[in-house]
Amino acid sequence: DIVLSSGHLNISEIWPLFDEAKKRGVNRLLCNHPTYVIGASLDDITRLVGMGAYIEHSMCMFVQRSKYKFYEPDELDKMIKAAGVDKTILGSDLGQVGNPSPVDGFRGVINICLELGYEENEIRKLISENASRLIGI
């Protein structure tokens, strides 16, 4: 069993890809940063989760001092709620020259989640447990 990541495909290309993957027995699906490059709406995120996909958001798009900060905390909250805590993964996509380190990104996104009212056990799922579950560990 593999994890099939949609990468930078447009949402219109992800539907047939994931449909075909499921027909062929692939059950571990991941959609990367659906609201950036991909063009997915919050409704699309909910629908992807309905297919069994995990939704990954890149911390670099939310944390301070990132060259790729495109979204505010309230938007992250909406994205998490569209997928649910159990199907959302927060990955770093940081560490480039001029950007915060991945560790600083994790600190930043954890603080954002705390400010948004997420509980410690929910944050642990978002930054660790869901990704572990996806890859089978």
Predicted regions and their residues:
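Divalent metal-binding pocket/active-site signature
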Residues: 1-40
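Structural preference for beta-strand elements that scaffold enzyme active sites
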Residues: 3-5, 28-30, 52-56, 87-89
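Divalent metal-coordination and catalytic microenvironments
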Residues: 4, 55, 93, 123, ...
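Active-site beta-loop-alpha junctions enriched in small/polar residues
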Residues: 9, 34-36, 58-62, 93-97
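Acidic (Asp/Glu)-rich catalytic clusters
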Residues: 18-23, 44-52, 77-85
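Charged helix-capping and loop-helix junction motifs
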Residues: 43, 69-76, 104-108
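Short acidic/histidine-rich active-site segments
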Residues: 85-102
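Mid-to-C-terminal alpha-helical segments outside catalytic/metal-binding sites
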Residues: 105-137
